[in-house]
């Protein structure tokens, strides 16, 4: 099948999935209803994934007709302990998505049944290595919420439609490891929900094109890495782009991230499972990254990719202990209370491996503002940590038209220069937003890797030049934009004016002659 045909089929599948999801929500706001659709997709996925895992083992053992979904709960119990160790959780056959779905329309206690099943799934992981990955995973799937209906009967009716709607989504054969239909559909739906939600959506979802750019910047010349980390991981889209581009096994020791919003944290963990990242290959924490980081025992990280919130408030020097925090102390100053951007930069730098790269989306103001931010920039440049600054176009993110930039950090640079790239024109217009194309991304990464000057696009600046500019790291300071105004040839213009004046004199003389003749 050609790539074009595959893409067409993928787009058709996406449209069909969105139509189902949109119809299911009814009068409920799409942003509020997303947890139900995405949660149900996850329920279907782990049911099919577990069933397939068990069936494959039985087929290999010689029982070609075995089907775990048809097994009795009593017989299945014998496998509980082993499956929890291998898969991280356990489900009885009666709890599987297909079996619950088959009777959903006539189940007067469907809400209670689903609640019990979700509790059992989470409970099965308690006391095991996977407990943290499953704990609270279904908390945002409230089967008794009035959003589903005013009465129990109405709520159960909506839940039954939800189950059957997700059942009707063509998510392929889970045995086919060449596709990632569940993960792909999940990412697509999150993108649609984020687009509809505007600003709030942008806080949990980084567009795929930007994720590709960050990952490629962070992995130039590498085919595998030790660990990947995101300090503000949202729904995990950036971390999973690393898995997609490098391959899951090429990230040898797993994916790490921290997210402050508990709903988004749950979405992230679900996203990991749907993309077939094993429970033992990811560690996502829910806490404030700046004041309560959760991965001290796992750092340093070879790849850090992040799109942290822009200019959010934080405690800063309101907490006297933070200036002594090993992440922030080296700069001798904390990021301003009203703008935590540089705190995320310092946090990422601190946890970056000596052979690693961090690619971080930044609010442009941190590149030129004075005060504490200027002092932190000076610290970064003095110690040769800034590898590149890349200016992006505006309108690349949900909910904001801000033209953001990317700061690339390294601890093991081969030179003491900073690459500045003006990629503000590298995009195409799609409806009301801009979008990076594969060609745009290729050009940015190619120049970044070659570290060469390109007129009106890139400039490799040395320490002296940056110091002369008071450690201003704005791309516009170092890359002169192309003058697109029409070029005027003054000599040619003057000649044309002289010819016009001469012609005017000739015409006046002729007019005067005509007037004289008329008067006669």
At which residue positions do the language-model features occur?
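A generic secondary-structure signal for well-formed alpha-helical elements
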Residues: 44-57, 193, 222, 246, ...
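A structure-centric signal for secondary-structure junctions around beta-strands
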Residues: 37, 182, 225, 252, ...
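Residue-level detector of flexible, active-site-proximal loop/helix-junction positions
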Residues: 75, 235, 262, 291, ...
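Residues within well-formed alpha-helices
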Residues: 20, 184, 241, 256, ...
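A conserved structural/catalytic subdomain of Rossmann-like adenosyl-cofactor enzymes
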Residues: 2-4, 8, 298-520
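Conserved S-adenosyl-L-methionine
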Residues: 200-306, 311-313, 317-322, 327-332, ...
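Non-catalytic, mostly N-terminal accessory regions of nucleic-acid modification and defense proteins
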Residues: 1-213, 217-218, 283-289, 391-395, ...
């Amino acid at each position: 099948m050609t790539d074009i045909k595959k893409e067409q089929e993928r787009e058709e599948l996406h449209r069909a999935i969105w139509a189902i999801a949109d119809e299911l929500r009814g009068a409920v706001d799409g942003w509020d209803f997303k947890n139900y659709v995405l949660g149900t997709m996850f329920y279907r996925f782990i049911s099919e994934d577990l069933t397939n895992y068990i069936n494959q083992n039985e087929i290999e053992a010689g029982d070609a007709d075995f089907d775990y979904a048809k097994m009795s709960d009593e017989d299945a119990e014998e496998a509980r302990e082993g499956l929890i160790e291998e898969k991280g959780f356990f489900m009885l056959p009666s709890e599987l998505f297909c079996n619950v779905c088959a009777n959903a329309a006539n189940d007067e206690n469907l809400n209670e049944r689903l609640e019990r099943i979700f509790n059992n799934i989470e409970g099965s992981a308690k006391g095991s290595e996977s407990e943290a990955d499953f704990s609270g995973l279904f908390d945002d799937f409230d089967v008794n919420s009035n959003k589903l209906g005013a009465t129990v009967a109405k709520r159960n009716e909506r839940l039954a439609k939800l189950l059957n709607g997700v059942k009707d989504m063509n998510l392929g054969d889970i045995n086919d490891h060449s596709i990632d239909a569940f993960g792909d559909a999940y990412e697509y739906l999150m993108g649609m929900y984020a687009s509809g939600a505007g600003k709030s959506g942008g806080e949990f979802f980084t567009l795929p094109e930007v994720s590709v750019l960050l990952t490629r910047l962070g992995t130039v010349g590498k085919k595998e890495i030790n660990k990947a980390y995101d300090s503000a991981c949202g729904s995990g889209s950036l971390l999973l782009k690393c898995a997609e581009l490098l391959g899951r096994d090429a990230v040898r020791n797993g994916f790490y991230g921290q997210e402050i919003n508990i709903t988004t944290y749950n979405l992230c963990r679900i996203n990991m499972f749907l993309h077939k990242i094993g429970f033992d290959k990811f560690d996502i924490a829910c806490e404030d990254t700046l004041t309560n980081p959760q991965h001290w025992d796992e750092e340093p990280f070879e790849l850090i990719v992040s799109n942290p919130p822009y200019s959010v408030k934080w405690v800063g020097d309101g907490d006297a202990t933070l200036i002594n925090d090993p992440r922030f102390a080296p700069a001798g100053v904390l990021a301003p209370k009203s703008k935590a951007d540089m705190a995320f930069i310092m946090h990422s730098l601190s946890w970056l491996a000596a052979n690693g790269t961090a690619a971080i989306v930044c609010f442009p103001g941190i590149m030129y503002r004075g005060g504490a931010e200027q002092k932190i920039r000076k610290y970064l440049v003095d110690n040769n940590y800034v590898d590149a600054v890349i200016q992006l176009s505006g309108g690349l993110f949900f909910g904001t038209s801000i033209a953001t930039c990317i700061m690339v950090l390294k601890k093991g640079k081969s030179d003491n220069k900073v690459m500045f790239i003006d990629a503000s024109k590298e995009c195409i217009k799609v409806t009301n937003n801009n979008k990076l194309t594969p060609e745009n991304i290729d050009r940015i990464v190619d120049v970044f890797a070659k570290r060469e000057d390109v007129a009106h696009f890139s400039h490799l600046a040395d320490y002296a030049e940056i110091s002369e500019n008071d450690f201003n790291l704005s791309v516009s300071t170092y890359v002169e934009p192309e003058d697109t105004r029409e070029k005027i040839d003054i000599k040619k213009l003057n000649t044309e004016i002289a010819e016009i004046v001469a012609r005017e004199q000739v015409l006046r003389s002729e007019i005067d002659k005509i007037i004289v003749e008329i008067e006669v």
